[in-house]
Amino acid sequence: MQPRFLVLLAAYNGMKWIAEQVESILSQRNVSVTLLISVDTSTDGTEQWVADLAARDPRVIALPFGEKFGGAARNFFRLIKDAPLSDFDYFALADQDDVWNGDKFTRAVDVINAQRVDGYSSNVNAFWPDGTQRIITKSQPQVSYDFLFEAAGPGCTYVFTRTLFTALQENVVSRFGELQAVTLHDWYFYAFSRANGYRWHIDDVPGMQYRQHSNNQVGVNRGVKAFKARLAQVFDGWYLNQAARIAQLVGMSDQPFVRDWINLGRVQLVRLALNSARCRRRPRDKFVFAGLCLVLALVKHKK
């Protein structure tokens, strides 16, 4: 029997690219695919397109329309909460605007079985309207607490075993109200998995073409403008406050390492800087993380 996949796709004003994305999902080789779509209230006809697709293709299920989520994370939390568990071996996430390689799922299954893991993600091949392409590498070796401070790559590369997805769904259902304050679903899903002892593998082989455009909610940090925007999120407290919130929601707030920094005081930020090697995967990010923590500690001291 072919592996059975349920793909959770979050859409919003997606008419420009959703057809190409859906075609690449439904064309996955040597697996059985069912596609579950949730549409954030749109103005470009996305709901009608999805409804028509679901009416003519039994592999496609549309969740009821009419909800305004205001962001991809809330849409994905809704998808996780409402996803049917029966009849599926694996569960995957999808954006509305990428293009998947035909062997994306067969490779994921092979890696999951070979590595004996419950969570899978991968590098991606990012591409821009001007024809530029670049491999985005997220497969640096995992460290003790990277999951509290970053995702395992783009969420559209994530694949969960039934065992992991069942546990994740139970968590999302029980924490649904609190999760509305979490901005990045892929970060949270990775954090939940690692915090609860599930093994995860980040594949160095890209399985998809990751489209970059002006409407990306979260994309590749490319250029000075994007870097400044990310830096502003760090200095206004969003980043570490999200880390603290995620640590609490995945049940790690009482862990000694987390207790040392979760209140984000000046001394705690210095401690966090000294532990940067355990907080980020990429060597450069370890140094940047330490520097940012020290700068934030200095800012708090001046206040």
Q: What residue spans do the PLM features occupy?
A:
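Catalytic donor-sugar/metal-binding loop of nucleotide-sugar-dependent glycosyltransferases
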Residues: 191-209
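Short beta-strand-to-loop acidic/aromatic patch adjacent to the donor-nucleotide binding site
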Residues: 88-97
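A conserved acidic beta->alpha catalytic loop
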Residues: 39-49, 69
